[in-house]
Amino acid sequence: MKKILLLFVVISVVACGGSKKAINSDKYTIESLQHKNYEQILGMYSDADPENGNDMMEEGTVERPYTILYPGTKDEILITWKDDAKTSIFDINYSENGKWSSATGIKIGTTYDELSKINGKEVKFYGFGWDYGGAVMWNDGKFENSKLRVFLSPTGRAADKFYGDRMIDATPEEIEALNLKVSTIMYRD
């Protein structure tokens, strides 16, 4: 009986420890910030050294307040707000391979092929060299109606035909040669 009780205690301790680890890793998913206000975010990330300001966004058409968490580090994440009181998030994005991730399994550095596989359907993308360069269209895949936005970048310089504000029509060989990887992940409410 003592062995059974001891086994139960050990299993309980291990199970609780695993649960705590999962909660901690979820803390740094882009989804963990959804529906939070500025004060709640500061409470969650007290070590974030936030920078705040206002700037022109969306190709210079709208001025929005913003907060940068972990500025100047690989963990930097930009939050733009719908209102000056910072009660409602407009969007969240990051571009470095730090501690942030998406609960979807998509991360900075995910390849074009991996992204298409996670989406369940081949993704399409816009040309490079403008504000929304490399923006992914989910092509009626798993993330079509999600609030997740992803941007691809080529490894190295791409040919001129892959630049501009238009959907890119590329052959599988051209896509492979571009060696596309996720370079920015955004959540937009």
Explain the meaning of each model-derived region.
Residues 4-13:
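Sec-dependent N-terminal signal peptides
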Residues 16-132, 137-140, 161-189:
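Short helix/turn-capping signatures at newly exposed starts of structured segments
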Residues 140-159:
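Long, compositionally biased
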